[in-house]
Amino acid sequence: MKQSTMQWETLLSTKRFGMEAYHKKDTEDRSEFQRDYDRLIFSSPFRRLQNKTQVFPLPGSVFVHNRLTHSLEVACVGRSLGTNIAHQLSILHQKSSNFLPEIGSIVSAACLAHDLGNPPFGHSGEKAIASFFSEGNGSFIKERLENETEWNDLIFFEGNANSLRLLTHQFKGRRYGGFAMTYSTLASIVKY
């Protein structure tokens, strides 16, 4: 059986969500993936991570800092890993796309965004939100929602899905497509 190779030109796209009609192939001083990273750094949702605690239970002590610091650290490690993987892929697939060097930028942008939609206390916070609506004082809201899908978003709250919502939702007075991230960056954020 013949082994198929990945089509990097198809997998890595500079097209932006919500701006498909405005796609241009020629870039200026930054790549489209570096623009994704920059859009995240300067965004309000990213800056709000400074108010969320990140707790690492380590043997003998508990290390506490905020999720903004955590996300910046994760982005640095992710960029290094992505760059190393891209280097190895370029050796294996010498005729592949010129996008391979951009994998580090894509991974670092995904790492920056990985906690955007998560509540304080991570998975415990997700469970608290879900139980507040399904079993607690928030159950009355079900009657006010337009459909079952909205209710399920609350009782099965999931931080990764909320991150994607934050990045793609059109906020009041803003452009269609939310952050208008590249499809490659959005795809890498879906499930880290």
Tell where the protein language model's regions lie, with residue ranges.
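Sequence-structural signature of the catalytic-core scaffold of metal-dependent phosphohydrolases
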Residues: 1-29, 41-52, 61, 72, ...
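Short hinge/gating elements
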Residues: 57-63
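Low-complexity, highly charged intrinsically disordered N-terminal segments
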Residues: 30, 65-68
